[in-house]
Amino acid sequence: MAQLDREDYALSLVSMIRLCGAITGWLTLAFIAFVTLSPIQDRPSIANPQTEHFAAFAVMALGFALGYPRRTALIAIFIVCSAFTLEAMQLLTPDRHGRLLDAVVKMVGGLAGIGAGRLILLVLQSQFARLRSPAKHSPS
């Protein structure tokens, strides 16, 4: 009975992680698009631009990696395309400029986020496997 409760808890935890990850990924993408295409004076600034680009794409990719764990290749393609598309779209605004370096930093941040997400999933899988396996030392 206790084993079943642990498995139910583990499954609900996985579902919650996926849901929160997907929501985080999409909300972060919307925020990045808004900030990237808004006038420069409306852009929030916390750190230097390269750090902000890296961190924003890392958070977005981490969310997507946790939210859609079986779609890693698709997420990687999406991150790379998003980085370059958003930089190119800045060329359409009069007060912004798209730069190749910014796109590369965003892409690297996104790939780092995917890597972090895969690592988190690997750790979670090993922990859940330990929950499912019978105790190695049964009381005699």
Model-derived features: positions:
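Bulky hydrophobic segments
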Residues: 2-103, 107, 111-140
